């Protein structure tokens, strides 16, 4: 019935696209008129549109004219005309949806339409790409259109100064990566003055490769952290013990499907014996699982995970004495990202490299919650349909499949499945040889660096024969995390006849594989060669070189087309169908022919874990011989079903994690907004007074509860708190003994006495100086309390799952306890602020401006772990005289400032100085 209805009425996607065709016709109708305009008249349209917006005209009413202006500018500046289907893609983006456009259909050019239209409002438009190279390329390329039309553009890449970032964000359109935008948001909430902030709000954003960023990285929080104490030697000790333990596989259980590993009962007993014999357990404890040894249990578990779950050259590589994570989805190195909870340190100990200190979180946000800050969110990709439900559920974004400008001529062959890895590799080598010899370019996709380099070794020594001639080795290029610097160049040449390119998953995404070669990259290489020879090419030289290259590339393209176009060969199926579709989508661009095929074996991870035994039994039943493959539609369907199950499981994990992070996100927004108000204010005295009165209200509620009799009051306890927090010695007992005296009278007298004392303290210095003291102190205090709160939430999140064993919903438990912790944060902020401002000795010296702490670590965690990181900034060993003089108030008793940061705090709290009073300075 559904198919019958679709036949007559079309799919919902077709109806959406058709509905936009009327506006496309209107845009086309304006083309002759705008083509006749001079450059100045066309540029003047921008100011005309802004003036109409200022008069109250809605933005949507400008869409037809604005899109027509951008199309004309594209023709004049870049020699590129937006196709009708690109106009449809631009409308979807303007509406806050996702445009699914196939590779080669010009997503980068499409983005110029909605960016121009939305930038007219003057609130800033952000365009997100997956790496710095693409951000710079797109900004310099498409920025020419925006500049021509009178709009400014900027680009945010790693290594920019604060001033450069501010200028880029103040541009009409800003390009950059999701990491850079996210970290700038977090840094803006660590600074101490509005002038230091770089971003100016979150108005409209377009995310390129939206599936990669909003789905694949959805479990990867952006974290700014600082180092804690050094436990590197202990990590090494535990690693040695665990390496010995796992030699006997009865000591642990490894669940590959869930990616988990735990000690068996035998393993627990064995490691306990070893630790006890080595004197590693706390004294006078019953065993490993005694509360005093819980941190040791944590170290053992992380060492176990590092040695069993994480594989060298697949999950990470070692480079320059560092463990660098590998992105499972792209195969790229994730430089700067570190796994949390000591797991990264455990891997460092495993590999024998320097063990870096653990980190404590100063600020964090998930990719999901960062992008949900924007009033309007849009995205582009070649593969989003398989995740349409998730985009709708989490981001409220619809996916629209945009028709191709030309028909797709790609042929997708059925998978070939072999019994063993060796048989599969033999067939892959034969297929590569055939393509190379016939002049057909081939892109080979692998799932890991290890697999790409193994295949490279096989190709280097492969003996083959073609037309009676014998050869050894096949020339090829390898594109993985080790060679990411050459990424764009390798991908650009992947379409020349006979080229063999091995790439991990979707490395090189964002750069088209053009049959015959990439003109822009060839020209860039030529310019570089000329520069090396000391020659500065003239415009005429460039035109002549371009003409020469057009002939050369045209001839090469004809040979590649005659051989069948680009052949895409997948060496394994990914857990996600979308990643497989991304690989397939590299061929068949702009109506070119192409072919794709996956070569699989029963030993591949996906098939082995989810369908290995059944598949092997079927192959035996059918009598499949050595080197033979089975190819059938039902087999493709069975693999797709296994992938759907894994996708659904991963989606549930992401959705569940988001529910937990939403709890933190609400609190984060509240704290960041409050902090922003503090920073922008010039006078916080009313807030300080309100805090003081709230503290007194808390005292009254605790020590003189409502409806309690006078003999039930705890006046002694109240007196202690008043002296400790307010610095006041008052005759509370005499007051309480007065006839008719109650809680309201106590509140009034305490408020009056505290206000008078605060006024006396303020008289020691000028009102302006006091406002400066209050503001600087309050900002530092809110940061300190928020950091401690994040640490408590981390600990809560790590143990809350155990509540499920007690038949209680862990999420509801987490919400309840997180709210209680947040209330405690607010209470502590009021109390600590009041105590310090009422009790410290005021000795004012003109303070240096407060700046964001230096030496912070920016971390974006591995998508597979989805774990949180622990956090905090390092303080120096005591404070220098200059630092002491710069303190707005003497917040420490005399001599305490010389305490070593890792030493015990002199206050007797039992905490380290850096985690107690030292954190205040």
Curated annotation (Swiss-Prot):
Source superkingdom: Bacteria
One GO BP: intracellular protein transmembrane transport
GO-annotated molecular function: ATP binding; metal ion binding; protein-exporting ATPase activity
One GO CC annotation: plasma membrane
Keyword vocabulary terms for this entry: ATP-binding, Cell inner membrane, Cell membrane, Cytoplasm, Membrane, Metal-binding, Nucleotide-binding, Protein transport, Translocase, Translocation, Transport, Zinc
Subcellular location(s) per record: Cell inner membrane; Cytoplasm
Principal EC category: translocase
Enzyme Commission designation: 7.4.2.8
Disulfide bridges in this chain: none
Membrane topology (UniProt): Peripheral membrane protein
Catalysed reactions listed for this entry: ATP + H2O + cellular proteinSide 1 = ADP + phosphate + cellular proteinSide 2
Cofactor: Zn(2+)
Residues reported in the UniProt entry to bind ATP: 86, 104-108, 512
UniProt keyword Protein transport present: yes
Annotated binding of Zn(2+), by residue: 905, 907, 916-917
Manner of cofactor binding, per the entry note: May bind 1 zinc ion per subunit.
Function statement: Part of the Sec protein translocase complex. Interacts with the SecYEG preprotein conducting channel. Has a central role in coupling the hydrolysis of ATP to the transfer of proteins into and across the cell membrane, serving both as a receptor for the preprotein-SecB complex and as an ATP-driven molecular motor driving the stepwise translocation of polypeptide chains across the membrane.
UniProt similarity note: Belongs to the SecA family.
PANTHER family noted in UniProt: CHLOROPLAST PROTEIN-TRANSPORTING ATPASE, SECA INNER MEMBRANE COMPONENT OF SEC PROTEIN SECRETION SYSTEM
Subunit composition and interactions: Monomer and homodimer. Part of the essential Sec protein translocation apparatus which comprises SecA, SecYEG and auxiliary proteins SecDF-YajC and YidC.
Name of the protein: Protein translocase subunit SecA
């Amino acid at each position: 019935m559904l198919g019958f209805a679709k036949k007559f009425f079309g799919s919902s996607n077709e109806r959406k696209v058709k509905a936009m065709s009327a506006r496309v016709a209107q845009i086309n109708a304006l083309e002759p008129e705008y083509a006749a305009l001079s450059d100045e008249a066309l540029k003047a349209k921008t100011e005309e549109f802004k003036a109409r917006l200022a008069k109250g005209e809605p933005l949507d009413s400008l869409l037809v004219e604005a899109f027509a202006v951008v199309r004309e500018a594209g023709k004049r500046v870049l020699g590129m005309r937006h196709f009708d289907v690109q106009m449809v893609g631009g409308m979807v983006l303007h509406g806050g949806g996702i445009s699914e456009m196939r590779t080669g259909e010009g997503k980068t050019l499409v983005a110029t339409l909605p960016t121009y239209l939305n930038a007219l409002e003057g609130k800033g438009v952000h365009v997100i790409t997956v790496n710095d190279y693409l951000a710079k390329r797109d900004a310099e390329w498409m920025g020419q259109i925006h500049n021509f039309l009178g709009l400014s553009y900027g680009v945010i890449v790693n290594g920019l100064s604060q001033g450069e970032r501010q200028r880029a964000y103040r541009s009409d359109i800003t390009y950059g990566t999701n990491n850079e935008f996210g970290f700038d948001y977090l840094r803006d909430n660590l600074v101490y003055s509005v002038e230091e902030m770089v971003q100016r709000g979150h108005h409209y954003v377009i995310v390129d490769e939206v599936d990669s960023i909003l789905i694949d990285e959805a479990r990867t929080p952006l974290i700014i952290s600082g180092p804690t104490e050094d436990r590197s030697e202990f990590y090494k000790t535990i690693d040695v013990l665990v390496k010995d333990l796992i030699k006997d596989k009865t000591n642990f259980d490894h669940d590959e499907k869930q990616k988990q590993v735990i000690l068996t009962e035998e393993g627990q007993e064995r490691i306990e014996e070893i630790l006890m014999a080595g004197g590693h357990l706390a004294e006078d404890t019953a065993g490993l699982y005694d509360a005093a040894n819980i941190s040791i249990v944590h170290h053992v578990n992380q060492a176990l995970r590092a040695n069993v779950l994480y594989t060298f050259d697949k999950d990470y590589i070692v480079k320059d004495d560092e463990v660098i994570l590998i992105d499972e989805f792209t195969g790229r190195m994730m430089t700067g990202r570190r796994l949390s909870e000591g797991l990264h340190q455990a891997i460092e100990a495993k590999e024998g490299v320097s063990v870096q200190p653990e980190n404590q979180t100063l600020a964090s946000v998930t990719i999901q919650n960062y992008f949900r800050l924007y009033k309007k969110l849009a995205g582009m990709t070649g593969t989003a349909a398989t995740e349409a439900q998730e985009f709708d559920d989490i981001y409220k974004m619809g996916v629209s499949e945009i028709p191709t400008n030309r028909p797709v001529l790609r042929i997708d062959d059925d998978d070939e499945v072999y019994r063993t890895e060796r048989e599969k590799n033999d067939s892959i080598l034969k297929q590569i040889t055939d393509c190379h010899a016939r002049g057909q370019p081939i892109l080979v996709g692998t799932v890991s660096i290890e697999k790409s380099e193994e295949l490279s070794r096989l190709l280097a020594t492969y003996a083959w024969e073609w037309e009676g001639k014998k050869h050894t080795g096949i020339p090829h290029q390898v594109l993985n995390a080790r060679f990411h610097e050459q990424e764009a160049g390798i991908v650009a040449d992947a379409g020349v006849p006979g080229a063999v390119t091995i790439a991990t998953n979707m490395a090189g995404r964002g750069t088209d594989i053009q049959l015959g070669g990439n003109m822009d990259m060839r020209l860039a290489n030529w310019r570089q060669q000329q520069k090396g020879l000391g020659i500065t090419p003239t415009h005429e030289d460039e035109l002549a070189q371009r003409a020469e290259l057009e002939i050369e590339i045209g001839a090469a393209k004809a040979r590649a087309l005659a051989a069948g176009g680009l052949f895409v060969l997948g060496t394994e199926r990914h857990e996600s169908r979308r990643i497989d579709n991304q690989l397939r989508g590299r061929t068949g661009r702009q109506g070119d022919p192409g072919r794709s095929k996956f070569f699989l074996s029963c030993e591949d991870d996906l098939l082995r874990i989810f369908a290995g035994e059944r598949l092997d039994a079927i192959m035996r039943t059918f009598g499949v011989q050595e080197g033979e493959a089975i190819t059938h539609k039902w087999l493709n369907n069975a693999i797709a079903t296994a992938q759907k199950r894994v996708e659904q499981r991963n989606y549930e994990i992401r959705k569940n994690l988001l529910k937990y992070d939403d709890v933190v996100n609400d609190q984060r927004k509240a704290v960041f907004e409050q902090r922003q108000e503090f920073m922008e204010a010039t006078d916080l005295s009313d807030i300080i007074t309100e805090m003081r009165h709230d503290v007194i209200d808390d005292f009254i509620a605790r020590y003189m509860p409502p409806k309690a009799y006078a003999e039930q009051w705890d006046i002694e306890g109240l007196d202690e708190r008043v002296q400790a927090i307010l610095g006041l010695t008052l005759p509370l007992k005499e007051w309480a003994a007065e006839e008719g005296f109650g809680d309201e009278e106590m509140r009034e007298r305490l408020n009056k006495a505290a206000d008078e004392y605060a006024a006396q303290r303020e008289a020691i210095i000028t009102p302006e100086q006091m406002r400066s003291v209050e503001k600087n102190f309050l900002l530092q205090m809110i940061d300190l309390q928020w950091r401690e709160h994040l640490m408590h939430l981390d600990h809560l999140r790590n143990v809350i799952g155990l509540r499920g064993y007690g038949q209680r919903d862990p999420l509801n438990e987490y919400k309840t306890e997180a709210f209680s912790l947040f209330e405690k944060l607010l209470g502590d902020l009021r109390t600590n602020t009041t105590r310090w401002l009422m009790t410290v000795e005021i000795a004012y010296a003109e303070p240096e401006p407060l700046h964001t702490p230096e030496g912070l670590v920016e971390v974006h965690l591995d998508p597979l772990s989805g774990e949180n990181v622990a956090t905090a900034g390092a303080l120096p060993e005591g404070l220098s005289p200059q630092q002491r003089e710069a303190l707005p108030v003497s917040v420490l008793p005399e001599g305490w400032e010389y305490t070593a940061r890792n030493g015990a705090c002199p206050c007797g709290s039992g905490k380290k100085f850096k985690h107690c009073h030292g954190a205040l300075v």
